């Protein structure tokens, strides 16, 4: 999706309190813009330009920030970000390229505004209420959640920690409402800042057992996720189908010691339980034969 697109003071505005300029105000780039993490813009025209620039640089879909978040210090979770016409500007520009817009947002007001503007995927959504979940279901948009729990809290500041706890308090209710209204669910990790956390990402799958059957979990993290990504149409960077095992599909395959349909916990320890790992047709791990595996096709 390229750089996240944020309003001034939004979740993607990671300027320090002493930084006053960014490209959206006609100033020099803020550091967060220089490194390609964010585009800080205000107004439909600026949002359109930022969206088109991301697409020019190869984005397969577009991500806007339409509500507060935990990682940022200066935007509370309850705030709503970008006016509807600004969000709609991004949606129109993305649709002209045959793809879609997703938004980072937790609170119901921001979710509802994004849906009304044509957004196709809500990233997070943990603080959603029942009327907004029904609106989401009726729209046919996706909810891409993470099974955030209290033990995931690795934030350094008390402000961030308090916001994370507020988000976790909504996880149960959000999943329950999503099941009640049969919302299209995707799964993600939201792992960032510390590469060491990636070794624990599969624990996010294991935690889903609290709300879903093993079959529902496996379907969500494979074929359902693939359906969401496929909405990028011709912008889709993958050469074959995702999330299926069939001729002509992208060869991303795992061979697991045991049956995840009976025991999803197996996925929480890939080092011991994944016998074969194939990504895009390349064998990266093969415990079933002697010798090096990497690079074999």
What are these regions (language model features)?
Residues 1-75, 82-93, 132-134, 139-158:
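Divalent-metal coordination cores built from histidine and acidic residues
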Residues 235-236, 241-294:
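C-terminal cap of metal-dependent C-N hydrolases
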Residues 1, 62-64, 101-103, 122-123, ...:
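Hydrophobic faces of well-ordered beta-strands that scaffold small-molecule active sites
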Residues 11-13, 72-74, 111-117, 138, ...:
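Histidine/acidic-residue-rich catalytic or RNA/ligand-binding cores of hydrolases
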Residues 96, 169-260:
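His/Asp/Glu-enriched, well-ordered alpha-helical/loop segment
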